[in-house]
Amino acid sequence: MTDSLIIFPAIDLKEGHVVRLSEGDMDRATIYDDDPAARARQFYEAGARYLHVVDLDGAFAGHAMNAAAVDAIVKAFPGTIELGGGIRDMNAIDGWLSRGISRVVIGTAAFENPDLVKEAAQKYPGQIVVAVDARDGMVTTKGWAEQSEISVTDMAERFADAGVVALLYTDVGRDGLKKGCNSEATLALAAATDIPVIASGGVKDIGDIELLARHTKDGIEGVICGRAIYDGSLDLKAALAIARQGGASA
């Protein structure tokens, strides 16, 4: 667990492009860049040392679909890269971690096959993140397309002793809409588990960063920032500065 909030700029990949979805809907994708590696390099030059990458096509297909773009990002961003999307077996985990990815995010497979997570966390300590994607407090799977009857806290409890490095909590109903991060639900999850929590979904502006940065001692490890950065309502350098200052405005 770091002392200050980790800012993860997000690069979501669809057919090799950098996009953002609204509420996880592939038909509501906005293209922001045709050069993912260049965008990753910009984030690094702005001061980011962590990056969150999602293979959106892979999330729906169940296997890697944007490998070339991810490889280019790895070369362009010398920091810590976290990757999710379609990682559903040990071969995929082995493959990505051997190609320079620092941490892999397991979502649907964690729900369907918890033993995979436990095996992977033993094999790769500090490199396995479990995605807890939820709508109205209930877990969603398969690219957010299917709703389960499992609560967020029940999902977290499954991995209490698995050795995962973090839980990535996404409020699907807010993702890509800039409605503001669901800090109440995120903090509730952090309070219910000893696993560090990464917040995602709906980050609107610096106010979300200030709030979350004040709760690193309460189990909040980081926050994923996507559309707000691309649309300009959140300045990455300012967010990084606020995170370093523990939520205090400069």
Curated annotation (Swiss-Prot):
Active site as annotated: D12, D133
Pathway the protein acts in: Amino-acid biosynthesis; L-histidine biosynthesis; L-histidine from 5-phospho-alpha-D-ribose 1-diphosphate: step 4/9
Coiled-coil residue windows: none
Keyword Cytoplasm (UniProt): yes
Location relative to the cell: Cytoplasm
CDD domains hit by this protein: HisA
Gene Ontology molecular-function annotations: 1-(5-phosphoribosyl)-5-[(5-phosphoribosylamino)methylideneamino]imidazole-4-carboxamide isomerase activity
Root EC class: isomerase
Catalytic activity: 1-(5-phospho-beta-D-ribosyl)-5-[(5-phospho-beta-D-ribosylamino)methylideneamino]imidazole-4-carboxamide = 5-[(5-phospho-1-deoxy-D-ribulos-1-ylimino)methylamino]-1-(5-phospho-beta-D-ribosyl)imidazole-4-carboxamide
GO biological process: L-histidine biosynthetic process; L-tryptophan biosynthetic process
Listed EC numbers: 5.3.1.16
Gene Ontology cellular-component annotations: cytoplasm
Cross-referenced Pfam families: His_biosynth
Keywords from the UniProt entry: Amino-acid biosynthesis, Cytoplasm, Histidine biosynthesis, Isomerase
InterPro entries: Aldolase_TIM, His_biosynth, HisA_bact_arch, Isoase_HisA-like, Isoase_HisA-like_bact, RibuloseP-bd_barrel
Entry-linked NCBIfam families: 1-(5-phosphoribosyl)-5-[(5-phosphoribosylamino)methylideneamino]imidazole-4-carboxamide isomerase
Protein family: Belongs to the HisA/HisF family.
Protein name in UniProt: 1-(5-phosphoribosyl)-5-[(5-phosphoribosylamino)methylideneamino] imidazole-4-carboxamide isomerase
Organism name: Zymomonas mobilis subsp. mobilis (strain ATCC 31821 / ZM4 / CP4)
High-level lineage: Bacteria, Pseudomonadati, Pseudomonadota, Alphaproteobacteria, Sphingomonadales
Gene that this sequence comes from: hisA
